[in-house]
Amino acid sequence: LLLSGPNGIGKSTLLESLAKGTAKGAKIMEGIRVGYYRQDFSTLNFEDSVRESLTKVLKEVTGKIDEEYMRSLAANFLITGDIINTKIGDLSEGQKGLVAFARLVLERPGLLILDEPTNHINFRHLPVIARALDQYEGAMILVSHVSEFVEQIRIDERLELDK
């Protein structure tokens, strides 16, 4: 679902309430894992290294740590060996975004909620993100004002919010 509308209408507020399960009149079914990408990266712990952040998610989801899988997935998001041991707080905004996306893939959510996922991402990295989202097989709610990005992703439904 592509959610669109003018700035200030409450798209981010709606997404957050859906992700937190506090939206009036909407309930996510019990047992559905929700992945939430916030444009302010507040889902990341800036004190963790990239490795620690990815490892925590992997251990939470699978109960084990598969270093080879984690590194392979990280590489798909341009997270290289020199970045993996860096504290998240020391990364550029674009690198934080790539870490947030790698975490989402590791989480294997049934519902993916994305609030302006192209913000802070280097334009050269957008195809990497678009490809990952296009291959995603669960439900997705996306807010993005970047039409060139959205065109690269399979969108089944569109909802325009207006006052």
Q: What are these model-predicted stretches?
A:
Residues 1-163:
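ABC ATP-binding cassette signature C-motif
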